[in-house]
Each structure stands twice: as C-alpha cells, then as structure tokens.
C-alpha cells in the first residue's frame, strides 16, 4: 500500500506518493485550484499537496495531506477537496515521520474509503 511518508505532529499527515519517499508522483501534474469557499479551518481537512512554488501552478499530482488542526496559513495555497468524517482517531495515531531523516517506508495505508456527500 501507499504510506504516510511525512507526518508532522500537530500539523498534518501526507500521503499519496507511490514511491513512499515524498518525491514521487503519478507521472503528470496539474494546477492548484484553491477556492475561498473551502478552508483549512478544522481537524481532518483533506487537501492536495504541492511543491509550494508559483502558488501551486503545475505542481499538484497524487500527493495529499490530512490536517491535525486548523491551518489557515494554507488557505489559497492548497486545494481543499474533502474532510475526514469518521476515523479521525486513526489519523491522529499515525506516527510522526520525517522523510529527510528516515529512508524506511512510512506507515502503510490498509484501507481508505472516499465518499461524496
């Protein structure tokens, strides 16, 4: 499975990299699509990760993150596309991990269900 390759306590858990290193992607990129109607204002916000360059233009791919609390400084910089509605206790239990400090794979994702509401 895919791992949570970057986990920062009190901030977020990042996943979606097929290589598990933080530097991989799906082989394509697309522009950031932030909306003023979707904000990083609560625990469990799900957003696209990007390179943080050019306001995310052409740097979104397969990576995403789940916030551990409100992160308003990310508004307008990352596209919010969902929220965790069940199982946030599991998300909060993901162990801290810095890919720059460890080459070992992160925690494997066993199952995630995404639904439209």
Can you name each region flagged by the protein language model?
Residues 1-117:
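Cyclophilin-like peptidyl-prolyl cis-trans isomerases
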């Amino acid at each position: 499975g895919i791992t949570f390759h970057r986990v920062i306590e009190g901030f977020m858990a990042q996943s979606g990299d097929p290589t598990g290193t933080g530097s991989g992607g799906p082989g394509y990129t697309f522009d950031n699509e932030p909306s003023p109607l979707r904000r990083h204002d609560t625990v469990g916000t799900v957003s696209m990760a990007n390179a943080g360059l050019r306001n995310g233009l052409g740097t979104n791919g397969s990576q995403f993150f789940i916030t551990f609390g409100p992160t308003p400084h990310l508004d307008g910089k990352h596209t919010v596309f969902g929220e965790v509605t069940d199982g946030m206790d599991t998300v909060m239990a993901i162990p801290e991990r810095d890919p720059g400090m460890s080459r070992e794979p992160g925690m494997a994702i066993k199952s995630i269900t995404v639904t439209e509401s």
